[in-house]
């Protein structure tokens, strides 16, 4: 896909016999653009824009990349279920984002929740997934650095 463009893909949609491949390709092109914009947002310390892009990326992973569940067993959709439950919580509090993270089919979700709602979210989501499966994390002001 690095050797073509979204416009070229769209010009040939009717010739491609794999709708899923088209959807996943659209994700690839859009995600590449999002990553560039996210890097710019971080460079400008525009964390609101970064979180917006992270949210868009997560929705695209779910809808277009389709890496939140395994096609072999469509009845088991743990990641989409936890994303939907988390989104209900976030809608209720009026803030935060969630997305699939990591391995996709066998991945986890990442939820960015306002600090003052963290304990409430942990309690809420634990009733569905078990407290042992919820890992609250902090975001450091400085990421990984090389010392020496």
Predicted regions and their residues:
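C-terminal nucleotide
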Residues: 1-99, 111-148
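N-terminal pre-core extensions flanking Radical SAM catalytic domains
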Residues: 103-109
């Amino acid at each position: 896909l690095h050797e073509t463009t979204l416009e070229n893909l769209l010009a040939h949609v009717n010739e491609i016999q794999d709708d899923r491949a088209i959807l996943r390709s659209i994700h690839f092109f859009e995600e590449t653009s999002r990553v560039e914009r996210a890097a710019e947002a971080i460079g400008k310390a525009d964390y609101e824009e970064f979180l917006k892009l992270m949210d868009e990326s997560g929705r695209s992973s779910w809808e277009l990349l389709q890496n939140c569940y395994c096609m072999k067993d469509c009845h088991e959709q743990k990641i989409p279920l936890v994303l939907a439950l988390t989104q209900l919580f976030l809608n209720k509090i009026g803030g935060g984002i969630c997305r699939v993270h990591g391995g996709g089919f066998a991945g986890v979700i990442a939820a960015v929740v306002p600090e003052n709602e963290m304990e409430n979210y942990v309690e809420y989501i634990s009733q569905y997934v078990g407290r042992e499966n919820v890992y609250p994390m902090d975001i450091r002001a400085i990421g990984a650095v090389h010392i020496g």
